[in-house]
C-alpha cells in the first residue's frame, strides 16, 4: 500500500521564501555549451547574410533605416555590419563579435570588410561543428592560427607592386564596385598630391564628381574644447582668412594671450592658437571671449612630441608666414606679439580629431628651402622612425591637400557613392603600400595547395587547418552566387586553373584576373583573413556566455515568486 506524506507548514514556508530570495538575487543570464554556441551562430548567420549580399560586382545594395533623415542605401560591408542589432542577447553577442571583425579590418586596411565577415562566419560554423563532435577547441584554434600564418606568407609571395597610374586606377575601380569614373578620380588625385599626399572626401554640391587640389597642411589634432565649434554642419570649427599663433611651450596665463586676442579683434579676423597646451586659466579666457563676446577663436594642441612637435610648428610657421613663440632662436615674448608675427591662411577647418590649414600665405622661396632641407635630412637619416615622420612632414609641406567632392542628384545617392569612394581610396593606399594579388577570391584559392602540405602537431590541429582550407573557398563562392551562377562549380573550376586565372563575375567568364584589372590589395586580403580567423576561432573556444537578465523578466519572476510565498504563508496559517 502506497503511503502519502505531506510537508509540514514550516517546511512549506521555508521552501517558498528561499525561492523568493533566489529570484530576487538573480541578475544575470548564464548559458553553457552547445545550446549557447548555436544561438551565437544564429546571430553570426544573420549578420553575415546581410553583409554577404553586397559582395562582388553583382552584389546587391542594402537599405538601412536611420533614426533621422532618409534611409541609407549602401553596398559598404562595414556600414551594413554596424547597423545590425538583434533582440536576442545571445544571438546579438555572436553578431557583435563578427561586427568587430569588420570594424578591425576597416580600420587597419580600409576595405575588405565583406570578405572578412564571410570568412569569419565560415570559420566559426566549421569550428562549432568540430567541437560538437568532441574536438578540443584550444587545439583547433592553434591549427587555425598555424594555417593563417602559411596563408599570409603565400599572399606575400603572390603579391606584386603597384607602380603605374593605370594599376592604381584598376585597384580604385574594383573597390568602387566597377565605377571607372571613381577609379580615374582617385588615380588623378594621387598623381596630383603624390602617394604620400593628403586626400579628403567631401559631399559635392553638383551632379558631377570634382577634384580640387588646395595647397595646405593637415595634422591629427583637434580643438581643445567643443565650445569653439561655430558651425551647425557637424562638430567643426570653420574660419576664412584667419590668423595663426604658434607657441612651442604651454600657455599658462590669460594675460600672455590677451595682446594676441586684441590684435585679432582689431583686425576683425579669426584667431587659431596652436600650442603645446593651454592651462585652465588661459583656456577659460578664450572660451569666455568666444561665448560672451563672440570672438572668433579656437585653440589646438600642436601635433607630435618633443623635437618632432617643434619641427612641425616650424613647418606650419614657414608655410603660413608666421613665427614660433617659445623657440630658443626667437627671443620675442608672447606678450610683445605684432601683426607680422602671426601666420595667415585662407581657410581653417578644425574637427574633434584633426586640423586642416588651407591656402597658407608663406613665402614660396622659404617653403622650397624648407622642403629641400627635409629631403636632405631624409637621405641622411638612419632611423626608420625619423624617416617616417619626416616623410609625413614633407607630404604636408609640398604636396598639398586633394579634395574629392562627390556629386549626385540626392543626399541618398551622394551618401552611397561617398562610401564607395572612401573604400576605393583606402584600398588604393593599401595597394600602394603592400602591392596587389589576383582578385575575385582567386588569391585565397591559390593558398589552399600550400595548406595541403601543412600538418599540425595532432589530429585536432589538423582539423583547424582543414577549417581554414574550406573557408578560403567562401569569398569566390559568394561572389559567384551573387552573380547568379553555381558557386561550387565556379570554385572547382578556378581551383583547377593556374596562377592568376580566376572567375570574372561581371562578364561571367574565366580569365587572367591581373590582365582584366580584377585585383585586390594584398594588405586588404591579408588583414581580412587574419582578423576573421582571430575572432572566429576565439568564438569557438567559448563554453559559457553571461548576459544581463532583461529587467521586465526579472521583475515578473520576482513578483510571481512573491505571490507564491504569500499564498504559502496564508495556507500555512490555516493549518494545511
UniProtKB/Swiss-Prot annotation:
First detectable expression is seen in the posterior part of the dorsal tracheal trunk at stage 14-15, which marks the beginning of terminal tracheation. In the larval gut, expression in proventriculus is stronger than in midgut and hindgut. Malpighian tubules shows low expression and late third instar larval imaginal disks and brain showed moderate expression. In larval ovary and testis, expression is strong in the posterior region. Residues 1-61 form a transit peptide. It comes from the Eukaryota. It is found in: Mitochondrion matrix. InterPro entries: Chaperonin_Cpn60_CS (IPR018370), Cpn60/GroEL (IPR001844), Cpn60/GroEL/TCP-1 (IPR002423), GroEL-like_apical_dom_sf (IPR027409), GROEL-like_equatorial_sf (IPR027413), TCP-1-like_intermed_sf (IPR027410). The keyword Cell division does not apply. Belongs to the chaperonin (HSP60) family. This is 60 kDa heat shock protein homolog 2, mitochondrial. It comes from Drosophila melanogaster. The gene is Hsp60C.
